[in-house]
C-alpha cells in the first residue's frame, strides 16, 4: 500500500481539490484508490457524493452509520477497538471512507490519548493509531 497525504494548517490552499483530482487521475491510470476523508468539514465527501447520498449518509435517524464515525464509535465510547470500515464505491477503482461533521468530537479523544501513550496505556495506543488502522482495514477490502 502506497500512501499519499496532504496536510497544511491553513485552510483554502487547495488540499481537498488537489486530492479529489489526483484520485480521479490515478484511477484513470488503472490504480486502485482509497480516499479517506478525515477532515471534520467533510468537504471531500461532499465532492464525491450526491446530495441525496449525503442526506442518507448523515441522516441522524439512519441506524446504520456509514461514515468514518462508525469504526471510531467503539473507541469514542471506550468499548474496545475500531469497528468495520465503511466504504462507498465511487467508481470501479475508487473507494471512499466518508467523512462526518461529528469527527471534530474525536479530536479531544486524540489529544487526551497522546499524553497517555507516554504512560504506555494500551487504550491510548488504540486511539492514536485508529485512523491509520481504519485506512489499512479499508485498503484490505
Residue ranges and their predicted role:
Residues 1-141:
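P-loop NTP-binding core
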Amino acid at each position: 500500500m502506497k500512501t499519499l497525504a496532504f496536510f497544511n494548517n491553513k485552510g483554502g490552499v487547495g488540499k481537498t481539490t488537489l486530492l479529489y483530482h489526483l484520485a480521479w487521475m490515478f484511477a484513470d491510470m488503472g490504480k486502485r484508490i482509497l480516499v479517506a476523508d478525515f477532515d471534520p468539514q467533510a468537504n471531500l465527501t461532499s465532492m464525491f457524493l450526491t446530495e441525496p447520498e449525503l442526506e442518507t449518509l448523515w441522516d441522524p435517524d439512519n441506524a446504520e452509520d456509514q461514515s468514518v464515525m462508525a469504526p471510531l464509535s467503539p473507541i469514542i465510547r471506550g468499548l474496545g477497538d475500531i469497528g468495520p470500515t465503511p466504504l462507498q464505491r465511487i467508481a470501479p477503482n475508487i473507494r471512499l471512507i466518508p467523512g462526518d461533521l461529528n469527527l471534530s468530537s474525536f479530536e479531544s479523544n486524540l489529544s487526551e490519548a497522546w499524553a497517555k501513550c507516554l504512560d504506555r496505556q494500551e487504550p491510548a495506543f488504540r486511539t492514536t493509531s485508529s485512523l491509520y488502522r481504519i485506512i489499512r482495514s479499508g485498503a484490505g477490502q
